[in-house]
Amino acid sequence: MATATEQWVLVEMVQALYEAPAYHLILEGILILWIIRLLFSKTYKLQERSDLTVKEKEELIEEWQPEPLVPLVPKDHPALNYNIVSGPPSHKIVVNGKECINFASFNFLGLLDNPRVKAAALASLKKYGVGTCGPRGFYGTFDVHLDLEDRLAKFMKTEEAIIYSYGFATIASAIPAYSKRGDIVFVDRAACFAIQKGLQASRSDIKLFKHNDMADLERLLKEQEIEDQKNPRKARVTRRFIVVEGLYMNTGTICPLPELVKLKYKYKARIFLEESLSFGVLGEHGRGVTEHYGINIDDIDLISANMENALASIGGFCCGRSFVIDHQRLSGQGYCFSASLPPLLAAAAIEALNIMEENPGIFAVLKEKCRQIHKALQGISGLKVVGEPLSPAFHLQLEESTGSREQDVRLLQEIVDQCMNRSIALTQARYLEKEEKCLPPPSIRVVVTVEQTEEELDRAASTIKEVAQAVLL
């Protein structure tokens, strides 16, 4: 039976072959021959290679132009034409041999040259030496580090705090410690560069919302909620974070924290709050934007700030619940792999905290001086003030751009240079232009401290007005 079936199939194949069009048979034959050739032929023939002559080699070598190892940098780049500071950059600063009133350094509370802070650092230097020469997990944890963490936690009224040896690395390490690939981060377009680097290291999905625009943020949260409903299994393992600054470095504006907290609970997200500018500035006791708004600090999942502004030291810290902070001790890259904070700087930060707690009126003084110069700088022809009246760091931008960023930078630098000639030290806000996610416009940054007198604030404002009129009109 099987033999008869096989014969019948063979007969059908022969009949189909006879009935097939001639062009079809020819095409199949060519393809079969081509496959056989590919199987048995060599990939190349040695005799087909032709060596270059000596003349051809010399011509190729002469024509070859190597790619530069680094990008071309103009000779007038700020990094190649820096100002040299002599002495501490406190109330008065000596720049290129000229003494100026300092409106450039983030020494908000005037503690950089404070005798008590220097004495504490000197005593620590004599006791511990200069540095630690090791990360916290490898004999780099000193008792003064634990004391500082305890003091910061108590000052901020949180369960625990952790310190880093470099301010920039604090938020840049904290974000990727929690947010991983597949997680979603909603971040303000005006976020500072340290936040951007933390987001990049996290490899999470980044969704940018318009600066301080809660309607735009809620739109993105709603869109994500709809996506989560389409794939509930994925949504269960996807974490959602909202990353904002208390006072924005790039704009000098304050975040609308009460609205952010409402959105957090409505859409089940976590809030990371970067307070490098608002810590030691906002609030009755300098605890930052949470105290300023009267928000329960437990509503914020993680708070970070550097100690290089108000505390006039080095490094940064994160604070929050114990289980949140403990995770960073195992996953915070800047904590695990960098040498710990030099003990003398930790001692200086502790003494700075002591001064802040003993003199809570200092924060009201700072706010009043911020309002004074903010008001005095209004109405400058050609310049506009960008930032809150209560922010100690704000920006002066051109009212109308020339259409060229390079030309805008040159005009603003001319204003900075002429102000320095009149003993007012200012600086432009600098950015890594090719790496910024949302590059801010060129601006002059003005920094206010408690050490500046009312007369000096008025003098700075009048100087900036006169110079701006001379340069821009």
UniProtKB/Swiss-Prot annotation:
Subcellular location: Endoplasmic reticulum membrane
InterPro entries: Aminotransferase_I/II_large (IPR004839), AON_synthase_class-II (IPR050087), PyrdxlP-dep_Trfase (IPR015424), PyrdxlP-dep_Trfase_major (IPR015421), PyrdxlP-dep_Trfase_small (IPR015422)
Gene, per the UniProt record: SPTLC1
Changes after translation: Phosphorylation at Tyr-164 inhibits activity and promotes cell survival.
UniProt family annotation: Belongs to the class-II pyridoxal-phosphate-dependent aminotransferase family.
Pathway: Lipid metabolism; sphingolipid metabolism
SUPFAM superfamilies to which the protein is assigned, alphabetical: PLP-dependent transferases
Regulation: SPT complex catalytic activity is negatively regulated by ORMDL proteins, including ORMDL3, in the presence of ceramides. This mechanism allows to maintain ceramide levels at sufficient concentrations for the production of complex sphingolipids, but which prevents the accumulation of ceramides to levels that trigger apoptosis.
Gene Ontology biological-process annotations: ceramide biosynthetic process; positive regulation of lipophagy; regulation of fat cell apoptotic process; sphingolipid metabolic process; sphingosine biosynthetic process
Subunit architecture: Component of the serine palmitoyltransferase (SPT) complex, which is also composed of SPTLC2 or SPTLC3 and SPTSSA or SPTSSB. The heterodimer with SPTLC2 or SPTLC3 forms the catalytic core of the enzyme, while SPTSSA or SPTSSB subunits determine substrate specificity. SPT also interacts with ORMDL proteins, especially ORMDL3, which negatively regulate SPT activity in the presence of ceramides. Forms dimers of heterodimers with SPTLC2. Interacts with RTN4.
Stretches for region Interaction with SPTLC2: 1-66
Molecular function (Gene Ontology), one example: pyridoxal phosphate binding
Principal EC category: transferase
Cofactor(s) this protein cannot do without: pyridoxal 5'-phosphate
Chief location category: endoplasmic reticulum
Enzyme Commission identifier(s): 2.3.1.50
Domain observations: The transmembrane domain is involved in the interaction with ORMDL3.
Membrane topology: Single-pass membrane protein
Keyword Cytoplasm assigned: no
Protein name in the entry: Serine palmitoyltransferase 1
UniProt keywords, alphabetically: Acyltransferase, Endoplasmic reticulum, Lipid metabolism, Membrane, Phosphoprotein, Pyridoxal phosphate, Sphingolipid metabolism, Transferase, Transmembrane, Transmembrane helix
Known role: Component of the serine palmitoyltransferase multisubunit enzyme (SPT) that catalyzes the initial and rate-limiting step in sphingolipid biosynthesis by condensing L-serine and activated acyl-CoA (most commonly palmitoyl-CoA) to form long-chain bases. The SPT complex is also composed of SPTLC2 or SPTLC3 and SPTSSA or SPTSSB. Within this complex, the heterodimer with SPTLC2 or SPTLC3 forms the catalytic core. The composition of the serine palmitoyltransferase (SPT) complex determines the substrate preference.
Positions bearing Phosphotyrosine: Y164
